[in-house]
């Protein structure tokens, strides 16, 4: 299947996602998965990672009692790396490129913002000189962002569950030393924030109901 047809399939799935979420559907994560699969299924480890994050977010949304926001978290988890898809690359910063694509296709803004800000994107955007581009999106509620980020940071590149420390180590090894993720301890700052007072002592996000 050509990249053009994959793009169209993803766009159609996102329009369906938007209608489902506007109508209060509780099964819209399947449309988010379809959109991600259309654009990422040919990317090997990237797609396996996304599948793992989707599964992790599903578990966390249930365990942490996020209520009606659970479908938003699940959708954002499936879509968090969609900006890596070659047809979407513009700035080269996948949270922004992905969020722009989602917004252009009518995805609810809360899902868009979770994709834009996931896993310390605010720190990396500053290092890349893309803070203004990221600021085009509103910051999402921290308790929802933490769920998506924790799911991402506890899923390895092949989709297997890993510790946050293992995942951060893998990221640092994978990116060259001149990458923005190495500057000023960006990855370390991300880890510290995920394990800060906003989460449990082990870095796991707090149940939303207890906040």
Predicted regions and their residues:
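Divalent metal-dependent phosphate-bond-processing catalytic cores, especially two-metal-ion Mg2+/Mn2+ enzymes
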Residues: 2-26, 38-67, 79, 105-107, ...
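N-terminal glycine-rich anion-binding loops that anchor highly charged ligand groups
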Residues: 28-30, 49, 71-74
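His-Asp-centered metal-binding catalytic motifs of divalent-metal-dependent phosphohydrolases/nucleases
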Residues: 69-102, 112-122, 152
């Amino acid at each position: 299947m050509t990249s053009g047809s994959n793009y169209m399939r993803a766009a159609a799935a996102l329009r369906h996602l938007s209608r489902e979420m506007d109508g209060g559907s509780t099964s819209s994560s399947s449309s988010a998965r379809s959109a991600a699969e259309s654009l990422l299924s040919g990317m090997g480890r990237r797609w396996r990672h996304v599948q793992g994050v989707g599964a992790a977010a599903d578990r966390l949304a249930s365990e942490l009692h996020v209520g009606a926001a659970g479908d938003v978290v699940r959708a954002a988890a499936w879509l968090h790396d969609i900006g890596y898809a070659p047809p979407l690359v513009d700035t080269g910063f996948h949270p922004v490129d992905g969020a722009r694509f989602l917004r252009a296709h009518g995805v609810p803004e809360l899902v868009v913002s979770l994709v834009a800000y996931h896993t310390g994107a605010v720190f990396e955007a500053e290092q890349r000189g893309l803070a203004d581009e990221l600021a085009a999106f509103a910051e999402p509620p921290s308790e929802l962002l933490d769920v998506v980020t924790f799911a991402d940071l506890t899923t390895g590149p092949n989709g297997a569950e890993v510790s946050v420390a293992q995942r951060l180590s893998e990221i640092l090894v994978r990116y060259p030393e001149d990458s923005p993720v190495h500057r000023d301890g960006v990855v370390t700052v991300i880890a510290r924030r995920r394990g800060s007072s906003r989460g449990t002592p082990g870095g796991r996000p707090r149940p939303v109901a207890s906040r």
